[in-house]
């Protein structure tokens, strides 16, 4: 048991280091790529570079993974066709994420301290999408914690299963929508969450 715990901690630490290096290298490349001059400006900011859009899109894998971890197990078990797709695609990422629960939290803290709090200065566009992804991650975590704290008669009932399916679908839709907007160089417009992300981004400038 202790060996498994040590392996999970070691794996989680390695994942965090690798993720941090990917973000750091991407940021360094982003700094060296000339910004594109474009007359179409988004919120009075120069049109984001390809690297900035790619980094912003990548961040949304965090709330997506958290949503699958919190709501996806029931859905995967109930639907065979989803299980087949899952095993051939996302399982390689989700399984290690589930086995090391601290990975998501450590990535959250790392992104918040380094990029949101301003240890490394980044553009408002990237900061907005990082903050928004972190808010979505927190929302998934809180809702998932509430669901798991419900009595078994409710959590594992037909209503509980359908609620988990609905939340998973919403998580997928929001993550894909926000990631697509990031790739297009646009700011998302998710009710309440986007406004909170804008306010947090401005308050940390």
Swiss-Prot record:
Regions that span the bilayer: 5-25, 54-74, 102-122, 130-150, 163-183
Places the protein is found: Plastid, Chloroplast membrane
GO CC, any one term: chloroplast membrane
Keywords, in A-Z order: Chloroplast, Membrane, Plastid, Transmembrane, Transmembrane helix
Topology of the protein relative to the lipid bilayer: Multi-pass membrane protein
UniProt family annotation: Belongs to the Tic20 family.
Protein name per the record: Tic20 family protein Ycf60
Source organism: Cyanidium caldarium
């Amino acid at each position: 048991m202790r060996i498994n715990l040590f392996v999970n901690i070691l794996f989680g630490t390695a994942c965090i280091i690798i993720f941090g290096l990917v973000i750091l290298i991407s940021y360094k490349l982003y700094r060296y790529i000339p910004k594109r001059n474009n007359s179409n400006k988004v919120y009075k900011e120069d049109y984001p570079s390809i690297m900035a859009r790619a980094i912003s899109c990548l961040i949304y894998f965090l709330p997506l993974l958290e949503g699958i971890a919190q709501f996806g197990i029931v859905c995967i078990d109930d639907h065979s066709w989803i299980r087949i797709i899952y095993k051939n695609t996302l399982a390689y990422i989700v399984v290690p994420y589930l086995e090391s629960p601290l990975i998501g939290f450590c990535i959250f803290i790392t992104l918040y301290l380094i990029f949101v709090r301003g240890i490394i200065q980044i553009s408002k566009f990237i900061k907005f999408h990082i903050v928004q992804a972190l808010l979505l991650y927190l929302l998934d975590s809180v809702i998932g914690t509430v669901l798991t704290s419900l009595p078994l008669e409710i959590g594992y009932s037909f209503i509980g299963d359908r609620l988990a399916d609905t939340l998973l679908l919403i998580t997928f839709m929001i993550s894909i929508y926000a990631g697509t907007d990031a790739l297009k160089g646009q700011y998302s417009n998710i009710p309440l969450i986007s406004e909170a992300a804008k306010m947090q981004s401005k308050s940390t400038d």
